[in-house]
């Protein structure tokens, strides 16, 4: 713990693009502009990249307790999914077809992606949106950031800005599937013109759409610090606790027709009936951040900070008909039912800094990051039928250390107010050591070191004040995750890091009423890691490098704002009475050559490796990469304070694997959501009250947004002593999303 506290003194990003970093409030207090904390990991207006900014106002519009991915669903090239089917619990987001392991996520510039799995588990930070000030989505490699390379995109989340005045806020929402959410927050404003203290807490419960997919989630957010005209110092402590009944196995294809909410979790694939009641995932995560932003002389700005992220938890599962000797080698072999817990304990700590110079058309940043992850993986058997077991014994035990270091330099140079030159160079080192035994008692000892050079360059031309064109090139490198490394080790293979060349070119029309953007991208992968159907000796899936694959497409997004002329009815009818927001992506996502492995099993379900079938596929589609993603939002404001929005989403078919097999796919789907919000002033009783209702999937379309597939062949003796084969047989599993459902709530600000 001493080491953790020692490292709680250094972490964030670079500063504003001008010398103005503070604003005066109505009370004449001066408060530092909080957005400078995230600028080093964000694209600026002159950056030659594709990005989208989502304000706190936009985030709050639909915030009734669903996870953050669902509040970003209408942004360009984004597809979301929910294991429980209703947006609460385990949720996921894909950008340009890339899942969360390939999307870099930062909170105030601090990496959120798990250092080993590289995934992002939004369930660990429930109701994060209530504490968010803004989010920027960059698509493609984007600018240099902290943590793993962005292969699909990056999400930069800024937590809430300190308020200069005291405030209080409370919200409650309820909805389908016994969903309930309560949130309360309060702040002191600036005390003695400089000091502040703010806090909030949330509680969310839901039964979920899928059977037993219940969630019980808690979160909190506290920040305190000092703000002046040239300095901001903040200490943040936030985190969450989650207990969710497992729903990550999906629903078998045949069950979709008769019982689309069937959940196999807790039944051990049908061997346990009734289902085990505590087949749950239990995890807690705590974030500590100490952030400093300081305006220096000579047009310099400094950001620095320290962080520690602590995680601890397990998932519990029932296993039927299991040999107890596999867990306790001192016991005689016997088949019994048991309950086991698979544990993870970890800490991730370190710091980052950025020094920014902005003057006379030059905007330059020099920064760096260091983080060390320490993790423990172990398992326990807490109960076995008719067998006395040692509940504290670890039947497997492993430990990991991962060091992540980067240093970068970035410069934007604006020449003659017309041309903006962009150069960004990053060096990143990753060292990973892991050893012990895994869940199948396999022994491992792996040491890996990777060195990555990630250059980026681009050009933005301002044809005039409204018309901008740009082009850029970026190189990204990404290390394999823990599963990739271990499965390669167990199968005596070499797993290579992935590399991607990202070329982007676009046009921006900066009109206040009709903004528009068009972006072309070509993402060329070398050694992309993909699932092949191949398994280790104990049945774990193996990802392998495919030499050549690519994604290319065009993204369109924009808005139309129709304003009422004149101000005769200003107190009754808002000026901006109707808006249309849209995005459209059309893409090709291809693997040039892909080898699929289909295994054969005998009558005892033992694998017969000599009968493995290998099929080579050419020019196939990359899994989970729809060629069309489109969204359309219509927003009407008929009277002041009232907003009515109709959000429409359409996604074309996606394949569950990389074979382009029409029998292994997600069908095209679309849905429409209707949200209504009405805000009224409270006058002497408070600031305002907002009533909100969100109707999801109003046309009750039944669809699936995620899934997985595997194929097997079966061998049998036909009596001649020769094994005959039957198959292959394909098994598809899907994650069904809820039909029509609703959430409604009230928010009061004091």
Task: Label the predicted regions.
Residues 295, 301-307, 462, 468-474, ...:
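Membrane-embedded beta-barrel scaffold of Gram-negative outer-membrane proteins
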Residues 111-139, 158, 255:
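Short acidic/polar hinge/loop motifs at secondary-structure boundaries
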Residues 282-439, 460-464, 472, 514-520, ...:
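Face-selective signature of the C-terminal outer-membrane beta-barrel domain
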Residues 18-61, 100, 515, 519:
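Short, acidic, small-residue-rich periplasmic hinge/interaction motif at the N-terminus
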Residues 69-111, 133:
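Extracytoplasmic beta-strand/coil segments of soluble accessory domains associated
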Residues 520-524, 542-658, 747:
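Gram-negative outer-membrane beta-barrel transporters
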Residues 174-205, 210-247, 283, 288-299, ...:
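Transmembrane beta-barrel wall of Gram-negative outer-membrane proteins
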Residues 4, 573, 650-655, 678-750:
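C-terminal beta-signal and adjacent terminal beta-strands/loops
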């Amino acid at each position: 713990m001493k080491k953790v506290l020692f490292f709680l003194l250094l972490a964030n990003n670079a500063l504003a693009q001008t010398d103005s970093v503070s604003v005066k409030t109505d009370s004449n207090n001066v408060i530092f502009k909080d957005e400078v904390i995230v600028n080093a990991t964000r694209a600026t207006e002159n950056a030659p990249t594709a990005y989208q900014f989502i304000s706190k106002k936009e985030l709050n519009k639909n915030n009734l307790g669903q996870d953050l991915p669902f509040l970003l669903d209408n942004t360009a090239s984004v597809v979301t999914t929910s294991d429980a089917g209703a947006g609460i619990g385990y949720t996921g987001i894909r950008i340009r077809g890339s899942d969360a392991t390939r999307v870099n996520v930062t909170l105030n510039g601090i990496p959120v992606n798990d250092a080993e799995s590289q995934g992002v588990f939004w369930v660990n930070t429930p109701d994060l949106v209530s504490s968010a000030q803004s989010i920027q989505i960059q698509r493609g490699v984007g600018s240099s950031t902290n943590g793993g390379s962005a292969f699909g995109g990056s999400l930069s989340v800024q937590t809430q800005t300190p308020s200069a005045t005291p405030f209080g806020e409370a919200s409650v929402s309820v909805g389908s599937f016994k969903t309930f959410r309560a949130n309360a927050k309060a702040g002191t404003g600036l005390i003695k013109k400089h000091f502040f203290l703010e806090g909030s807490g949330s509680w969310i419960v839901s039964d979920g759409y899928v059977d037993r997919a219940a969630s019980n989630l808690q979160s909190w957010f506290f920040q305190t610090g000092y703000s002046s005209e040239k300095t901001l110092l903040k200490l943040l402590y936030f985190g969450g606790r989650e207990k969710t009944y497992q729903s990550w196995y999906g629903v078998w294809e045949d069950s979709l027709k008769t019982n689309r909410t069937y959940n196999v979790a807790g039944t051990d694939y049908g061997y346990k009936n009734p289902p085990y009641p505590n087949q749950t995932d239990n995890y807690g995560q705590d974030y500590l951040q100490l952030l400093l932003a300081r305006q220096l002389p000579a047009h310099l700005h400094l950001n620095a900070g320290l962080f520690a992220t602590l995680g601890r938890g397990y998932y519990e599962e029932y296993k039927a008909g299991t040999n107890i000797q596999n867990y306790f080698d001192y016991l005689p072999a016997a088949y019994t039912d048991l309950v086991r817990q698979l544990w993870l304990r970890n800490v991730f700590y370190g710091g980052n800094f950025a020094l920014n110079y902005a003057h006379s058309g030059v905007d330059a940043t020099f920064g760096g990051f260091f983080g060390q992850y320490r993790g423990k993986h172990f398992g326990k058997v807490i109960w076995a039928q008719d067998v006395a077991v040692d509940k504290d014994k670890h039947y497997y035990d492993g430990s990991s250390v991962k060091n992540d270091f980067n240093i970068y330099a970035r410069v934007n140079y604006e020449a003659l107010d017309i041309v903006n030159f962009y150069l960004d160079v990053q060096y990143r080192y990753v060292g990973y050591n892991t050893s012990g035994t895994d869940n199948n008692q396999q022994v491992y000892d792996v040491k890996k070191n990777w060195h990555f050079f990630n250059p980026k360059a681009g050009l933005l031309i301002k044809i005039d004040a409204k018309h901008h064109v740009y082009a850029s090139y970026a190189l990204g490198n990404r290390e394999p995750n823990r599963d990739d490394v271990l499965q390669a080790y167990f199968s005596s293979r070499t797993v290579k890091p992935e590399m991607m060349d990202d070329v982007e070119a676009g046009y921006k029309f900066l009109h206040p009423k009709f903004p528009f953007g068009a972006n072309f991208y070509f993402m060329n992968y070398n050694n992309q890691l993909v699932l092949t159907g191949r398994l280790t000796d104990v049945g774990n899936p193996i990802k392998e490098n495919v030499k050549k694959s690519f994604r290319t497409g065009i993204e369109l997004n924009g808005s139309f704002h129709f304003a009422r002329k004149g101000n005769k009815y200003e107190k009754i009818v808002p000026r901006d009475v109707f808006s249309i927001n849209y995005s459209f992506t059309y893409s090709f996502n291809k693997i040039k050559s892909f080898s699929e492995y289909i295994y054969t099993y005998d009558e005892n379900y033992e694998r017969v490796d000599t009968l493995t079938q290998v099929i080579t596929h050419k020019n196939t589609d990359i899994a989970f990469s729809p060629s069309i993603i489109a969204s359309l939002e219509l927003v009407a404001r008929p009277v002041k304070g009232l907003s009515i929005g109709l959000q429409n989403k359409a996604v074309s078919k996606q394949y569950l694997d990389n074979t382009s097999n029409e029998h292994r796919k997600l069908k095209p789907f679309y849905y429409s959501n209707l949200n209504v919000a009405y805000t009224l002033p409270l006058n002497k009783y408070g600031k305002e009250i907002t009533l909100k209702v969100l109707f999801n999937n109003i046309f009750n379309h039944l669809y699936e947004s995620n899934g997985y597939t595997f194929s097997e062949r079966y061998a049998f003796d036909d009596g001649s002593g020769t094994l005959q084969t039957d198959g292959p047989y394909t098994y598809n599993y899907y994650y069904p999303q809820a039909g029509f459902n609703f959430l409604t709530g009230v928010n009061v600000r004091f």
